C-alpha cells in the first residue's frame, strides 16, 4: 500500500483538524506544513515533528508531495490550487471552493488537464444524522422527493469576524454567512436529492 505524502497549506484555526485526519491514517504521512507566519508554521511543525515552510510553492518544489490540503482564506484557494495542480499534486481544499465562478471553473479545469483530483471539504455529509437521511432517501423509504427547504440558524459572534482581516468581506470571504456557513446546508440538500440546482431565488437583509 502506497503511503501518500501530504502537505498542509495554512496553519490557522482549521489546521488541527486536517493534521489529525492525516496523521491518524496508515496510508498517509504529513511531511510538511506551510504558513506565511513563520512562528506559526514553525510551532506546528515542531509539535507534529515535520518540516515547516513559509511559501507553498517552495514546499511543493522541495517535497515530493502527493496531496496538499489548502486551509487558507477563501480568496486564496484558487491560486494555491493552480500551483498544486500544475505540479500534478492532488488537492483537498477547505470550503468554499472559490469566491466566484471563474476561479472555481479554473480550478476544475486545472485538475482535469493535469490528471489530478480536486476535493472540497464538506464534512457534514458524514454526520450520523446526514447519513441516516441519505440512506432513507436512497432506499426509497421516504418516497420521492418533490421539494426541499433549507433553514440555517447558526450564529457567529462579533469576535469570529474580528479575529481576522478577511472574514465578513466580499472581496476575500466572498459572501458572508451564505458562503461560509450556509454552504454546508446547501451541499447537504444537493447530496440528499442527488441533483444540481436549476435556478436560484434569493433575498438578503440585515
Predicted regions and their residues:
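Predominantly a Rossmann-like dinucleotide-binding segment in NAD(P)-dependent oxidoreductases
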Residues: 124-206
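Beta-loop-alpha module in the N-terminal Rossmann-like domain of NAD(P)-dependent dehydrogenases
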Residues: 18, 50-110
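N-terminal Rossmann-like dinucleotide-binding module
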Residues: 1-48
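Rossmann-fold dehydrogenase core element
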Residues: 106-123, 143-150
